Amino acid sequence: MHRRPFLSRLCLGAVAATAGCLSRRDDRDHSATSRTRSTGTDASPPRSTDRTRVAAGDTARRTVGTGSLDAGGLRRPARIAFTNPTSEPHDGTLTISRRDERVLDEPVTLAADASLVASLTDLDAYTARVSGPTLRGEQTATLRPGGFTCNATSTAITVQDDATLSSTRVSTRMACPGVVTDDVAAGDTTTETVGAAGAGGDYAFRLRNATAASWTTRLRVDTDSTPRFDGVYTLAPDSTAVVRLRDRRAYTASMRVLGTEATATARVTPADFDCPSAATRVSIDAAGSLSVARDPSASCTTSSV
């Protein structure tokens, strides 16, 4: 038996020579574990009697989620693939879970050089697992929210010639202006800036975790319908993420707490930049809900919905 190249089938193209997205934890946004067992007559059967059969050289594609990543922001969907680049067919089940919810559970027979590819269209934490009666073991791969960037990213769980499994993450490496992923330690504050200094404005959106638990959040800033900033923050207790705006114009900030799906939106106008120390403060409470308030030190008003 021999292995055939598969990564080109993922359509990721050549790796760009530019720097990657601004991220302080890229290496931790993907991980993989494996466990090997011998095959035999006592192998567990697939959980479903409907088995997808993918012909040699073909790819079966699935879409998982509501498509929210295509609706706005600077991040794009990521893919998880179960691939068989060997010359022999293999049976396996690809299971993908979003937090505690199973979102895909598909038994499949992959002929030689065949694959099953799932596109994840909602930003969240995912775990993928492959196992099967013709495979020597199982493989698990995880994708954290920060693994969704402006790049084309794919995690492939691949059958080897000896029927074991391996996991590889492949991504283009284009620069991603405005895309930030950060873990903020307890009591700390991290600050990012949108626009150039001296551009005539200074306004801040402040997102604070006022609880004793850690929360993962997404903070987007748009001008009109154009995305300008897309941050994913894991906020430890009593930590804050700040986005400072330097361009004097209208902005909309959209915030979401992953896990509770709580959302909030705040808007500012060019006139709001006249306020001294102008800021909109957003707080996460113990239930994972969001509250929006104008900085009490400023006299202007900010609309929120």
Task: Enumerate the predicted regions with their spans.
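Terminal disorder- and signal-encoded targeting elements
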Residues: 1-305
